[in-house]
Amino acid sequence: MGAANKKQELRLKRKARIRKKIAGTPERPRLSIFRSARHIYAQLIDDTKGVTFVTASSNEPDVKNNTELSGKNKSEVAVFVGKLIAGRAKDKGISSVVFDRGGFVYHGRVKAVSDGAREGGLNF
């Protein structure tokens, strides 16, 4: 087993531990974060029905074609993604969420998304 597989295996164990404790509801959906080497993804999920309300990522055209973000680092783009998902959540009438870091350390881009979402008006 390579080091990368071991690292991912440990992250998935952390993710499972976290998911045992938290769940999204229609009133307070789960803000789930996934971080890849290049992009960051966020979605609001109702776990009772298994429905995704809102998504935002650094891989979508709204973010990729934004001239303000050209030349920015990944953490600054993550803050924008957080603000984007907060704005989309407000449009759907969602103001309070449960934060799910997805097994990732609450640092760097994961923290940047949460900071952006809080700046955008989400409560968690």
UniProtKB/Swiss-Prot annotation:
Record-linked InterPro entries: Ribosomal_uL18_bac-type, Ribosomal_uL18_bac/euk
Protein's UniProt name: Large ribosomal subunit protein uL18
PANTHER family attached to this UniProt entry: 39S RIBOSOMAL PROTEIN L18, MITOCHONDRIAL (PTHR12899), LARGE RIBOSOMAL SUBUNIT PROTEIN UL18M (PTHR12899:SF3)
Gene (name only): rplR
Record's subunit section: Part of the 50S ribosomal subunit; part of the 5S rRNA/L5/L18/L25 subcomplex. Contacts the 5S and 23S rRNAs.
SUPFAM superfamilies named in the record: Translational machinery components
Molecular function as annotated in GO: 5S rRNA binding; structural constituent of ribosome
Source species: Desulfosudis oleivorans (strain DSM 6200 / JCM 39069 / Hxd3) (Desulfococcus oleovorans)
Keyword line: Ribonucleoprotein, Ribosomal protein, RNA-binding, rRNA-binding
A Gene Ontology BP annotation from the UniProt entry: translation
An annotated GO cellular component: cytosolic large ribosomal subunit
Family, similarity comment: Belongs to the universal ribosomal protein uL18 family.
Role summary: This is one of the proteins that bind and probably mediate the attachment of the 5S RNA into the large ribosomal subunit, where it forms part of the central protuberance.
Domain of life: Bacteria
